[in-house]
């Protein structure tokens, strides 16, 4: 079978074109660091990379959610730390108010002190975050949850929750009712078996009103005032216990968020390595292949050039 000069030319050109395409592809891989830039480069790896990319995006979203949750929980804990101090100060005032030898002026002075503590607690209960949203209003964050005059709660009834991992949703914002209008199951009961007061502001209002009432020379009013002070004292114990219970929960959540962050970081690192194995170049392999392909291409160029200069007259010399 005769092979024409044209056929030899076309075969050599085809070989050169293919070698050049492969060499340029290897060069592109070296410049980008990616072995797979198009699905056709490795359909299986490309498909797995798409799925893995979605998992990476989800992991990043949960990381952002945990950052937001940590900020919310930390802010609530900071405010409740101040609430704890204020309640403890109020308890000290109430214990002192139980002294039966106080004059009406002394009692009035204590009432003023308690009113200041109540105002402080009201401001804390109506605290806002950096965006002006009320942190103890549940999902009704645009309006103050507590009424300044009555201490009544008008915020949302549902706690704010946030999904912080694929299988974990947690409370990141308690309602004001859960903190300032609630007591625990082991609360100190009333001696007569009646329901214990739950509203912190009502407790303080009861004591303030009793301390403002003159009792000197009036045993009936003195007994009423003493009963009111005792009731407030029990109420403050219950309220403080409730706040401390919520704070313990917040501490547990902050610890869990930290653990989830560590797991998320480990997961992100594993996903990054897996993605690299799927689409990134093996530098030793690609550099070696690039050099070999370059040498082969140069040899093909030389062969083609030599063939172009060949003729029967040159062969017979």
From Swiss-Prot:
It holds the Pfam family Flagellin_N. GO terms for biological process: bacterial-type flagellum-dependent cell motility. One of its GO terms (cellular component) is bacterial-type flagellum hook. Gene3D superfamilies: f41 fragment of flagellin, N-terminal domain. GO terms for molecular function: structural molecule activity. InterPro entries: Flagell_FlgL, Flagellin, Flagellin_N. Keywords: Bacterial flagellum, Secreted. Its main location: secreted. It is found in: Secreted; Bacterial flagellum. PANTHER family: FLAGELLAR HOOK-ASSOCIATED PROTEIN 3 (PTHR42792:SF1), FLAGELLIN (PTHR42792). Belongs to the bacterial flagellin family. This is Flagellar hook-associated protein 3. It comes from Salmonella typhimurium (strain LT2 / SGSC1412 / ATCC 700720).
């Amino acid at each position: 079978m005769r092979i024409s000069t044209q056929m030899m030319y076309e075969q050599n050109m085809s070989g050169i074109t293919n070698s050049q395409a492969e060499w340029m592809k290897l060069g592109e891989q070296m410049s980008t660091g990616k072995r797979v830039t198009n699905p056709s480069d490795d359909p299986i790896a490309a498909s797995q990379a798409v799925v893995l990319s979605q998992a990476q995006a989800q992991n990043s979203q949960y990381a952002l959610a945990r950052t937001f949750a940590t900020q919310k929980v930390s802010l609530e804990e900071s405010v409740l730390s101040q609430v704890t101090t204020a309640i403890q100060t109020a308890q000290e005032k109430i214990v002192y108010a139980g002294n039966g030898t106080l004059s009406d002026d002394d009692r009035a002075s204590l009432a003023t002190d308690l009113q200041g503590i109540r105002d402080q607690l009201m401001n804390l209960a109506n605290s806002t975050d950096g965006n002006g949203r009320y942190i103890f209003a549940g999902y009704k964050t645009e309006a103050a949850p507590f009424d300044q005059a009555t201490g009544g709660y008008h915020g949302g009834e549902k706690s704010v929750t946030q999904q912080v991992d694929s299988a974990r949703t947690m409370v990141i914002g308690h309602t004001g009712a859960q903190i300032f209008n609630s007591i625990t199951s082991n609360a100190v009961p009333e001696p007569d078996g009646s329901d214990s007061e739950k509203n912190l502001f009502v407790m303080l209002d009861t004591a303030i009103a009793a301390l403002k009432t003159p009792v000197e020379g009036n045993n009936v009013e003195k007994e009423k005032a003493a009963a009111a002070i005792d009731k407030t004292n029990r109420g403050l114990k219950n309220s403080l216990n409730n706040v401390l219970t919520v704070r313990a929960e917040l501490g547990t959540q902050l610890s869990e968020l930290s653990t989830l962050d560590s797991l998320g970081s480990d997961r992100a690192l594993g996903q990054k390595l897996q993605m690299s194995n799927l689409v990134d170049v093996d530098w030793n392999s690609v550099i070696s292949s690039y050099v070999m392909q370059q040498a082969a291409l140069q040899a093909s160029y030389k062969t083609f050039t030599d063939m172009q200069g060949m003729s029967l007259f040159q062969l017979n010399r």
